[in-house]
């Protein structure tokens, strides 16, 4: 029993040391968190990107606009437009046409709940919405208020067999008709957002599109049911371009004007555990930005300014992804968006392990058994190194009498004894450190596998057998850690004991 306790203490110390290193990196590797101050009131005007370059706004644009100082009160939830698809339950606010609620129907909020996981929402507990609009000299979204769209219906539902669902919103002002259309595709999370601007006036129309995510400083709701021993994962902004696919931008860096990048194929978003929301421009170059207003954080892009002549029209398009971090789907949206599944420094190994794990799952259909098979395959792949270790240990045992004789002969002269020992090792072609080789090879592989298990949304609420009904959560009864400790003790007893009495005592 004492031996088992020693093994478990060693394992606990190693795990604790690793967790402390990760916690130190999260707490001290970057600047301290931004000091939060209460908001006096929530305003619509503060949500609109300014083109004046004022403090707290996005960088100055090529077309200036006077946003004014007036603010308005957001529309009430009773006027929201409901949208139901095979993937989403959404609500759109006619004031601005923003998505203010998005529930993912294929993901439960908790393991024992039938309620869907809510990614976007706008209430007293959390503010996290996807906004877009038109700004500039003739823009319909200003600090004075958002455009109030009209809709042909209060609710839209994707029927069985229907491949796409369009939700058109219209707004008219001074001879200009703006049609903002959300297009949903069956079986997919990306949402197409288009602005068709028809200028029937006698004057040219000037403006630009913006798309952004607005989030407050509330915690990640996906981490609330993981327990006190769960590993904290990244919550913050991120962006990428084809030349620089994945970059993190913590909330406490949003107000530093660090994000000033233009791209026509990039993306910008907010990342949390298992889920991500991101905007990407489709047919124009977007100027990425981030900013902070009180407790609210904004990250998004502005389009280049456009000029629409009288009696002409133009369409601006963007794509919103709001869903799980499924790598195969993220790849189709934008380059580098799949890297929001963040495996850390060991990502090359992790990607290979996940590809193998995913392939095994397609055959077995159970993620738990797939993990076991993957672990066995990893052990088999390291068998050559283990055999080298066993061979070295056997050679060391055969050399034990000669080494003991050296110790008696040169016991007082450690330098001479070391030289003679190295000579024997060289003569017999033995590496005394070869016994550590399997451990050195296994550590990066199993650490990479650990991050695969932590980051893969496929394991969220995935059952295995018996009491293990969520592979993303720790064992509630700690049975698996106990079994691991027992197996390590048995494996230790099966290994040959060192011939040196002191080494044998240490290994007991």
Predicted features along the sequence, with ranges:
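Soluble non-transmembrane domains of integral membrane proteins
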Residues: 80-339
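Helix-loop-helix
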Residues: 1-40, 92, 195, 208-231, ...
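Juxtamembrane extramembrane loops of integral membrane proteins
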Residues: 10, 26-119, 173
